[in-house]
């Protein structure tokens, strides 16, 4: 109400599983104007840093947050050529088991803490611990 501009900065893109979306809804509901400036989604940045394309040719891709449940992840793995699994750190061991059972662990790239000091981008390492900002790109391969 003091005629000031404020900024809310987020990692990745504000439109993809960002806490910022909830804050923006409250700000709009309170009667304030907003402007959203797009960012680079973490999985796009991670794929570029890993040197892998997310999709090629006629391949399909799903983006699934692990907090939506392991069944959602399994469904995506069953129905899409490539799957991005976001916010994977909390249940990573259970996820390794699913990927092992489906023979997909060696087709998985891990992006952990992209752009941060402790960034890890590389193959799945079941002995390594991963945090909240962990994204997996599972490339099953498919239609070219």
Which role fits each region the language model picked out?
Residues 1-2:
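Ligand-binding beta-strand-loop-alpha-helix segment within the catalytic cores
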Residues 5, 46-48, 62, 68, ...:
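Sparse, context-dependent recognition of short Cys/His-centered cofactor- or disulfide-binding micro-motifs
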Residues 6, 77-144:
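A contiguous loop/helix-start segment that scaffolds small-molecule binding in enzyme catalytic cores
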Residues 8-10, 36-39, 56, 85, ...:
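General beta-strand structural signal in soluble alpha/beta enzymes
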Residues 11, 61, 83:
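Conserved short-loop catalytic and cofactor-binding motifs
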Residues 15-78, 127, 141:
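Class I SAM-dependent methyltransferase SAM-binding "motif I" and its flanking Rossmann-like core
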């Amino acid at each position: 109400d003091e005629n000031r501009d404020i900024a809310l900065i987020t990692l990745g893109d504000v439109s993809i599983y960002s806490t910022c979306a909830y804050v923006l809804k409250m700000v709009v509901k309170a009667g304030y104007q907003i402007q959203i400036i797009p960012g680079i989604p973490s999985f796009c940045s991670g794929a570029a840093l890993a040197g892998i394309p997310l999709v090629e040719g006629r391949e399909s891709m799903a983006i699934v947050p692990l907090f939506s449940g392991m069944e959602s992840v399994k469904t995506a793995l069953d129905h899409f050529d490539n799957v991005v699994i976001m916010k994977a750190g909390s249940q990573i061991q259970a996820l390794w088991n699913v990927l092992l059972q489906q023979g997909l662990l060696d087709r998985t790239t891990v992006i952990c803490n992209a752009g941060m000091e402790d960034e890890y981008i590389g193959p799945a390492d079941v002995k390594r611990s991963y945090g909240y900002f962990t994204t997996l790109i599972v490339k099953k391969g498919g239609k070219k």
